[in-house]
Structures are given as C-alpha cells and as structure tokens.
From Swiss-Prot:
Gene Ontology cellular-component annotations: cytosol
GO biological process, one term: spermidine biosynthetic process
Gene Ontology molecular function, alphabetical: adenosylmethionine decarboxylase activity
Protein name as catalogued: S-adenosylmethionine decarboxylase proenzyme
Organism: Alkalilimnicola ehrlichii (strain ATCC BAA-1101 / DSM 17681 / MLHE-1)
Cofactor note: Binds 1 pyruvoyl group covalently per subunit.
C-alpha cells in the first residue's frame, strides 16, 4: 500500500466510493398532547424540503461537488426527503439548468446515466411517545461520493445544521482504484477514526465512542451530548414554571430517551441512567 500522504498517479478515474451516513436525533419534552402535536408541526416546518435542499446544496459546495439534479418532497402528515445527484467534474450548461428545476425525481433511464456519479440524500422522521412527553426528531443523511472528493469535509457542517443530541455516523470506503503500474488501492487517505474530522468544540460537547473495522475500511462513531440544559429541551413550557421534583423527572425521562437511542436498546424500567 502506498503512503496516503503522497499523491498516487492513477490509471484513469478514481473509482473509490466513499460513503458517510448520519442518523441525527433531536430530543424534546412536550408535556401535553397539544404541545406534542405543535412540536411535530414546528419541526416539520423548520426542516421542510426547501430548508433541507439548502443544507444539502451547501454540503455539495463544501465537498467541491457539482450538482446534476435535485428532487425533493414534503410528506403528509409529516416528514420530508431530498435527493441530489452530484458529480466531481464540472457539468454542462444544459445539465446545470436542469439541476435548477425541482421535480419528482429522475426517470429510470436518467438514473442509469448517472450510476457512476455520487449523491446526497436526507429523510426526516418526527415522532413522539404515545403516553409521555418525550418527542424525537430524526434525520437520516447519506453523502456518497465517487472520485477524489470526500464527504468527510461536510461532517461538522451537518452536525451544526441540526439540533443534534445524538449522532450515529458510519463511514466506509468501497471498491478500488489502480495506479499507473496496475496496483490496486482500496483507500486513498489516512483515517483511524471519524473523530479525526470533528472540530474541537464538537468533541468537547459530545461523549463519543468508536467501533471500527480497519481491515474493511469501515468506521463507526456514536455521539451523545454531555450537558442537558432543561430549558433548551422544553417545548411550550419554561423550566422556571416547574416544581423541582417535576424538573428532575423530566430530566430523567430525557436522559433515558437519549441513552436508549445512543445504546440502541431499551433499558429496564428500574435501570438508572
């Protein structure tokens, strides 16, 4: 394997596919059924298809990609999806004009023409507990690039674009590219953790753990916010209006919800967090 710090002369196009997947969770406490309904409507409006399109357009700009096509959709009763096809090379004027047109998505024959290209997608999932006041908003984001451009450049921007309490990230490199001598290269950059690409303020704000499979070029990082300021988690209510015992109970419910999402399992009813 060549040193990743030095540039390798490739035979043809860089065929490596680099994919970065996010699951971002925003947790909130809305006491009444009316407040929970209002929260879901609020979050659905804040992260509608138009706003998500702007976020993903910024991501394309950050990683140095060219936009080929945009498809977006708001769903009823809630949720939104946006898909952007991107390429590494500059696009023609005709393709650039087509990218400005918002439509239901490319037809199958159009997709076949871009199988060697890259994409950015986002889907949102607002939901709430049926009995308690905890509500959770989830955004799933995938940034997949083919060539030298790296989705890792957009890491910090995406984390800061959402009110992220828990973040689950997967980064993988697939395929191979050849150098001029015909030797295969299965990765073209140094990495031992996704955390290498996190800003210092992000590392300080979150508790993080890694599960990496280096020989498979597969990297997994989970993050959960360290500090819980109750005022920032109440919807339609102020912490100052609550009794101390009620504040403690709400904080317990919020921390439990975050811990279960972070661990990926339900805790026992009497298990402390």
């Amino acid at each position: 394997m060549a040193e990743h710090g030095s540039r390798v002369s490739l035979h043809g196009f860089n065929n490596l596919t680099k994919s970065l997947s996010f699951n971002i969770y925003d947790v909130c406490y809305a006491k009444t059924a009316e407040q929970r309904h209002a929260y879901i409507e609020y979050i659905d409006e804040v992260y509608n298809a138009e706003r998500l399109t702007q976020i993903l357009t910024d991501v394309a700009d950050i990683i140095g990609a060219n936009i080929l096509n945009i498809a977006r959709q708001d769903y009823e009763p809630q949720g939104a999806s946006v898909t952007i096809l991107i390429s590494e090379e500059p696009v023609s004027e005709a393709v650039a004009e087509a990218a400005d047109q918002v439509g239901p998505g490319p037809l199958p024959e159009t997709v076949l023409g871009h199988l060697d290209k890259s994409h950015i997608t986002v889907h949102t999932y607002p939901e709430s507990h049926p009995d308690h006041g905890v509500s959770t908003f989830r955004a799933d984001i995938d940034v997949s690039t083919c060539g030298v451009i790296s989705p890792l450049k957009a890491l910090n921007y995406l984390i800061h674009s959402f009110d992220s309490d828990i973040v689950t990230m997967d980064y993988r490199v697939r395929g191979f590219t050849r150098d001029v001598r015909g030797r295969k290269h299965f990765i073209d950059h140094d990495i031992n953790s996704i955390q290498n690409y996190l800003a210092d303020d992000t590392k300080e704000r979150y508790h993080t753990i890694d599960v990496n499979v280096f020989q498979e070029n597969l990297f997994h990082t989970k993050m959960m916010v360290r500090e819980l300021d109750l005022e920032n988690y109440l919807f339609g209510e102020s912490a100052g209006n609550l009794e101390p015992a009620e504040r403690r109970e709400i904080e317990r419910q919020l921390r439990r919800e975050m811990t279960e999402i972070f661990a990926g399992r339900n805790l026992a009813p009497d298990q402390e967090v």
